[in-house]
């Protein structure tokens, strides 16, 4: 699956999910979020592998970007062409991303924007093309685990013949409820 250009502009904080209905989101189309003037914060999901030409270009209020843990192709010029408004970039990959020199097209003030990288990777980023231009490279702890999962145990009812019921039965009989035999009177 991929994120494509929509007619309703994205606003505020946008999180591109890793999956939608169990399918991985692997690509952000060129111009997908182009000129989204009200987009302020962007989090790119961990399954995204490709971001197209000017995917987030001309989003003049974009100030905070979080890049995925996985390796992603950022080889298109002007991908973050955002009028020098980006103030923070959070890189979650322990290996510095390979990016095209024109990725920001002058949209990042390297002296003001803070580049956050995983603990222990500051030197690697400082030695990498494009990333070495940042004056402020700060290490931060990066969580790569799944957190805040709410599991709601649903009540499951079946007849003795194995037919699944959508609710607790109101007709007397013997049923299976969450794997146990239950008598309903």
Task: Please give the residue ranges for each predicted region.
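A recurrent domain-boundary module in secreted/ectodomain proteins
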Residues: 127-143
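A structural signal for leucine-rich repeat
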Residues: 79-82, 102-108, 128-129
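Residue-level detector of functionally pivotal "anchor" positions at catalytic/ligand-binding pockets or at interdomain
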Residues: 138-161
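C-terminal tail/sorting-segment detector
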Residues: 174-185
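Consensus positions within tandem repeat domains that build extended binding/scaffold surfaces
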Residues: 29-32, 52-57, 76-79, 103
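Short, small/polar residue-rich loop motifs at catalytic or cofactor-binding pockets
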Residues: 21-22, 150-153, 168-170
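Structural signature of tandem-repeat unit edges
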Residues: 9-27, 36-50, 59-74, 83-98, ...
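GGW-centered surface loops in extracellular recognition modules
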Residues: 1-9
């Amino acid at each position: 699956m991929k994120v494509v250009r929509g007619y309703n502009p994205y606003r505020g904080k946008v999180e591109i999910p890793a999956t939608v209905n169990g399918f991985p989101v692997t690509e952000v189309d060129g111009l997908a979020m182009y000129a989204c003037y009200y987009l302020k914060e962007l989090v790119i999901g961990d399954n995204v592998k490709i971001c197209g030409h000017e995917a987030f270009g001309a989003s003049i209020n974009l100030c905070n970007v979080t890049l995925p843990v996985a390796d992603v192709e950022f080889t298109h010029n002007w991908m973050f062409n955002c009028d020098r408004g980006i103030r923070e970039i959070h890189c979650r990959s322990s290996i510095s991303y390979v990016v095209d020199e024109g990725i920001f097209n002058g949209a990042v003030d390297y002296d003001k924007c803070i580049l956050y990288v995983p603990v222990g990777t500051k030197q690697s980023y400082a030695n990498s093309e494009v990333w070495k231009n940042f004056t402020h490279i700060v290490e931060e702890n990066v969580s790569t685990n799944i957190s805040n999962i709410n599991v709601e145990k649903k009540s499951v009812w079946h007849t003795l013949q194995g037919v699944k019921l959508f609710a607790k039965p109101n007709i007397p009989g013997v049923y299976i409820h969450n794997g146990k035999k239950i008598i309903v009177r």
